[in-house]
Amino acid sequence: MCSTKVPNERTEKMNSGLISTRHQVDPKKELSRILRTDAAVKGIERKANSEKYLTLWPKAVLEALDEAIKENRWQSALKIFNLLRKQHWYEPRCKTYTKLFKVLGNCKQPDQASLLFEVMLSEGLKPTIDVYTSLISVYGKSELLDKAFSTLEYMKSVSDCKPDVFTFTVLISCCCKLGRFDLVKSIVLEMSYLGVGCSTVTYNTIIDGYGKAGMFEEMESVLADMIEDGDSLPDVCTLNSIIGSYGNGRNMRKMESWYSRFQLMGVQPDITTFNILILSFGKAGMYKKMCSVMDFMEKRFFSLTTVTYNIVIETFGKAGRIEKMDDVFRKMKYQGVKPNSITYCSLVNAYSKAGLVVKIDSVLRQIVNSDVVLDTPFFNCIINAYGQAGDLATMKELYIQMEERKCKPDKITFATMIKTYTAHGIFDAVQELEKQMISSGENLDIL
């Protein structure tokens, strides 16, 4: 930690604790859940580096693996998988490999995926369509489209592993995210040649890709093809992609027009639709329309969710309309909708921008009395707020509590604190943070 002494500007607050670090146990949690998390899962991870444990309880190992995959901890997942392979009861399964490829794709680890594929073959398993599709996804998400396409070509040569509509859709999704719409067109042509029709998900993927790229003519052209197809009709996801695209492009007229046209097609909106409308009107500064959507939702018995309230709170906060933001936050709590870390981030950012440090203090007090799960972005937000306010003591205390809350500081955390300490001429604190930054694996070049 930084050894530098800083002015203790909020002694009372520091003594009482900024954020309660007591472990708050929910009495409704099942004992089995606690045991699984605290004993089985963590225990398996500790044993993953050892050669001794060859007769572990199957349920514990498999749940530990699922937990690591779910949380995208690819290194832990591979260690646990290696431990799994050593168990006397282990049987190789394609489904397990497919799950591992998924996490490796999410974490952009193509080399690890290639090695894992070799391990799979060495165990005598015959890859399935799902395995190849997952491998294509890994390469695509890692921006290795050549490898993704070569895997697709290999699939075509395997008699019982011909690529299906899901395989093509996964590849299309990767190309859309990389802006390779030339390849998207060639994939669709190839699908037609092979007699593989586009599904609703395929069309939606292309529509969403064009929309996010601001290619509205192409987006509407694909929608026309979808309607003409007749077998894969537009659904609420299509609606959300279309209006979301025009909303992001600040084309409110088109957004509202397509909303009405989809209703005439019999496609009914869902909560995501309304959230998109609220967000779009908010970004455009059309606050009356934003509020009218919320009123419409309540009249139609759509429950306003945490996401809905977060959008409105952030919108009013960014606009500097603090009173309106506070009104919405009060309504949120009155309606029994639970705030999350994103809610509190928006509040802190707005108060910080308005110079209302006292209000930020009140946010901290509310968090102490709640069971909200805090994350690194929240700590970055509130550390920045107190840093800008010149309250270095509180900033430092919050940094300490990050570790107590198991929130790992990232490059934003370090950059924010280093900038603040530099501005105040506290250079020994800067040096200490730079050391911690290096030891944590962060790059000093970002500073």
Curated annotation (Swiss-Prot):
Family: Belongs to the PPR family. P subfamily.
Keywords: Repeat
Signal peptide span: none
PPR repeat residue intervals: 93-127, 128-158, 164-198, 199-233, 235-269, 270-304, 305-339, 340-374, 375-409, 410-444
GO molecular function list: mRNA binding
PANTHER family: EXPRESSED PROTEIN, PENTATRICOPEPTIDE REPEAT-CONTAINING PROTEIN
Organism domain of life: Eukaryota
Descriptive protein name: Pentatricopeptide repeat-containing protein At3g53170
PROSITE patterns tied to this protein: PPR (PS51375)
